[in-house]
Curated annotation (Swiss-Prot):
Feature: DNA-binding region: 27-46
Signal peptide: none
Gene label: gylR
Species: Streptomyces griseus
Keyword Transcription annotated: yes
Pfam families assigned to the protein according to its UniProt record, in alphabetical order: HTH_IclR, IclR_C
Domain IclR-ED residue range list: 82-251
Protein name: Glycerol operon regulatory protein
Alphabetical list of InterPro entries matching this protein: GAF-like_dom_sf, HTH_MetabolicPath_Reg, Tscrpt_reg_IclR_C, Tscrpt_reg_IclR_N, WH-like_DNA-bd_sf, WH_DNA-bd_sf
Annotated S-S bridges: none
Length: 254
């Protein structure tokens, strides 16, 4: 069994200590409460301070939680609220389309799958929650890249690897794909990530009307795009699902 890293355990203990009780604590209070030497406690606090997890009040020298923790906490809450709001609608999408439905968000130059509804049949399927999908080739990734400025920068600066013979990798051509995605409000992956697989996705917006993720379906290309393009009914179903989740997040009418 792997041993825990002591310095990380101590840093976590400090953050928990600062999160409870008094808002600001001095070095002596922190060291004595955690049973640490002052030098050890000070070194850990300085590292946490450098990362923005801890702030030191100039006048008193006392420590408190930093703004970076709030940002991390908000990111956690945003993703979990998004998933909670999408549960019913993605279930409906999978049922109406007969295909697997996915909800994805931007994470580390890729698409993190945060919710996955199995295709409603008896076939063997693997849960993909937690999986990372490419940002430049998947329908979810294109949608996020088209509507999220951060993702747009990430995908242009990152490696757009050739995954199949259909993958668009050249910058100008990729920008045209994103322009088309913005114009019609959805994106298509037609065997650009996996041979024989197609996907269709639309953006999800929050109360600030910012793109916070993408929802869509994935399945065999012969079912999703039998004539080289998705059926109008499928596009409508995906866009309606994204609009419903967006409304539940406070985005208003889409």
């Amino acid at each position: 069994m792997a041993r825990n890293i002591q310095s990380l355990e101590r840093a976590a203990a400090m953050l928990r200590l600062l999160a409870g009780g008094e808002r600001r604590l001095g070095l002596s209070d922190i060291a004595s409460t955690l049973g640490l030497a002052k030098g050890t406690a000070h070194g850990i606090l300085r590292s946490l301070q450098a990362e923005g997890f801890v702030e030191q009040e100039p006048a008193s020298g006392r420590y408190q939680l930093g703004a970076e923790l709030l940002a991390l906490g908000n990111s956690y809450l945003d993703v979990h609220e998004l998933r909670a709001r999408a549960l019913v609608w993605t279930d409906d999408l999978a049922r109406s389309s007969g295909e697997a439905a996915y909800l994805g968000v931007l994470h580390q130059q890729g698409v993190l799958i945060v919710h996955h509804v199995f295709r409603p049949d008896d076939s063997r399927q693997v849960l993909e929650v937690g999986a990372m999908h490419p940002l430049h080739s998947t329908a979810h990734g294109k949608v996020i890249s088209a509507f999220d400025p951060v993702a747009h920068s990430e995908v242009l600066e990152g490696d757009r690897a050739t995954l199949t013979g259909r993958t668009v990798t050249e910058a100008a051509a990729f920008e045209e794909v994103l322009d088309l995605t913005r114009a019609r409000g959805w994106a298509l992956d037609l065997e650009e990530t996996w041979e024989g697989v197609a996907s269709l996705a639309a953006p999800v917006h929050d109360r600030r009307r910012m793109a916070v993720g993408a929802v869509g379906v994935t399945g065999p290309v012969e079912r999703l795009c039998p004539d080289g393009a998705p059926a109008t009914e499928l596009v409508t179903a995906v866009r309606d699902c994204a609009a419903a989740v967006s409304r539940d997040l406070g985005a208003g009418r889409f």
